[in-house]
Swiss-Prot record:
Post-translational modification Phosphoserine, affected residues: 12
Molecular function in Gene Ontology: growth factor activity
Identification of the protein by name: Oxidative stress-induced growth inhibitor 1
UniProt-listed InterPro entries: FAD/NAD-bd_sf, OKL38_fam
Cofactor note: No monooxygenase catalytic activity in the absence of NADPH.
Induction: By pregnancy.
Superkingdom of source: Eukaryota
Main location: other
Cited function: Monooxygenase catalytic activity. Involved in regulation of cytokinesis; promotes RHOA activity, probably acting locally at the midbody in late cytokinesis. Monooxygenase activity is involved in stabilizing transient structures between daughter cells, termed intercellular bridges, before abscission. Regulates differentiation and proliferation through the regulation of cell death.
Length: 477
């Protein structure tokens, strides 16, 4: 972090910024890249395999994608995202990836410094966000090429680091390092402030003496504290626009049952890693109980199996439920996850086990935990079952922490009467600008707006950058 940004954050009064980005994960990094003047154009000789998109691209030669009509360009595109702009940017960056191809991007990038918009990116961690909190050796779900940001492919970065991609997939540590390196290589570091915790984002008309504003237009006030040398330094900044890019890993989901606060109950895989390192959990221990039927739970099963730690794996759904994520993953790309799914299907707690040390407990409801390290379940027939365990991992998802917003952000959700949820009730945004439908100047991107894969969050950055550039162009001098 540059000293200028530290000074800027430490000041309680300054000229309002055009943009503050809250969150420094892939979404925030990509948006910072676009706001720093890096501008995408179609290569003059590029031919896109999608005929309709190719025709539209030839209609405006020499015009940047940011300056074109994103609604028009994205019309007719289909893919694995509900966001039309996400599909558009993905199609431009990776034209035939869904068909197994490796065609190069049809985009070329120019650095137009005169179009840069001053901004600051606030994050608790180093650039890369929650990727720095994931166990580094864990192989990531997505193919490595889908984790990359504009104009620096993960594959090329890995080769320069004298490393190769295993099965086209990288580790979480690789990706965290890549994102941090991306900020450095693209010269974005002066925009980023790590160790910044945002505690409030409020909208109102400031006292001109407090923010140096030239007029009395309403602004966002972003308050919080900067952690430095084990001390907390408060800050308060004003901005015309705020972009929420915090992701959803802030607050692990909880079961809400008696005993969940007991010390042997955990909600992160790192607890099992720590217990294994210090010998608190061994192959001779009582089983580790893993709750959940998603990829985080599968990662925990794989980790425990690697260290020969006995596992009871419990989940509410049936193993053949089409909604299970395992039923949506290609077996060739994700053999280890399909192995877990096979174990879940075959290893009922009531049947003999060809997989020593693993038992599944499908379609069971967890009732409570007891202080003597026992977990009480109920099956479909209402029969209670009690198991002794050494440690419990509750891995059933996570929720965004938007406690810094009024009403924890629920007022901005698609259904304001329900809790905010990245999968079921995201922030309601315009699909072509990602601006909140309920608050001018407030944007949301990434999982908060319903884009849950790095591959598609970049489309949100494109939409936000295009909208902000239009605003700044219209703003009177």
């Amino acid at each position: 972090m540059s000293s200028s940004r530290k000074d800027h954050l430490g000041a309680s009064s300054s000229e309002p910024l055009p943009v503050i980005i809250v969150g420094n994960g892939p979404s925030g990094i990509c948006l910072s890249y676009l706001l720093s003047g890096y501008t995408p154009y179609t290569k003059p000789d590029a031919i896109h395999p999608h005929p309709l998109l190719q025709r539209k691209l030839t209609e405006a030669p020499g015009v940047s994608i940011l300056d074109q009509d994103l609604d028009y360009l994205s019309e007719g595109l289909e893919g694995r995202s509900q966001s039309p702009v996400a599909l558009l940017f993905d199609a431009l960056l990776r034209p035939d990836t869904d068909f197994g191809g490796n065609m190069k991007s049809v985009l070329t990038w120019k650095h137009r410094k005169e179009h840069a918009i001053p901004h600051v990116v606030l994050g608790r961690n180093l650039p890369g966000g929650a990727w720095h909190s994931i166990e580094g050796s864990m192989v990531i779900l997505s193919q490595g090429q889908w984790m990359g940001l504009p104009d620096l492919e993960v594959k090329d970065w890995m080769q320069k680091k004298r490393r190769g991609l295993r099965n086209s997939r990288a580790t979480a540590g690789d990706i965290a390092h890549y994102y941090r390196d991306y900020v450095v290589k693209k010269g974005l570091g002066h925009n980023f402030v790590s160790g910044a915790v945002v505690t409030a984002v409020e909208w109102g008309t400031p006292d001109p003496s407090s923010c140096g504003a030239q007029d009395s237009s309403p602004l966002f006030q972003v308050s919080g504290f900067l952690t430095r040398n084990q001390a907390q330094q408060p800050f308060s900044l004003w901005a015309r626009n705020v972009v929420l890019a915090t992701g959803t890993f802030d607050s692990p989901a909880r079961l809400g049952i008696p005993g969940e606060a007991l010390p042997f109950i955990h909600h992160e895989l790192s607890a099992l890693e720590a217990a294994t390192r210090v010998g608190a959990v061994t192959p001779a221990s009582d089983p580790v109980l893993i709750i959940g039927a998603g990829l985080s739970a599968a990662d925990a099963v794989l980790y425990a199996r690697h260290y020969n730690i006995p596992v009871i794996h419990a989940f509410r759904r049936a193993v053949d439920d089409p909604g299970l994520v395992f039923n949506q993953l290609p077996k060739m790309l994700y053999p280890e996850y399909h192995k877990v799914h096979q174990m879940m299907r075959e290893q009922s707690i009531l049947s003999p086990s060809p997989y020593e040390g693993y038992r599944s407990l499908p379609r069971h409801q967890l009732l409570c935990f007891k202080e003597d390290c026992q977990a009480v379940f109920q099956d479909l027939e209402g029969v209670e079952k009690v198991f002794g365990v050494s440690l419990v991992l509750v891995l059933i998802g996570s929720h965004p922490d938007l406690s810094f917003l009024p009403g924890a952000g629920a007022d901005f959700a698609v259904d304001p009467d329900q809790p905010l949820s990245a999968k079921r009730n995201p922030i309601d945004v315009d699909p072509f600008t990602y601006q909140s439908t309920r608050q001018e100047g407030l944007y949301a991107m990434g999982p908060l707006a319903g884009d849950n894969f790095v591959r598609f969050v970049q489309g949100g950055a494109l939409a936000v950058a295009s909208s902000l550039l239009r605003k700044e162009t219209r703003k009177p001098p």
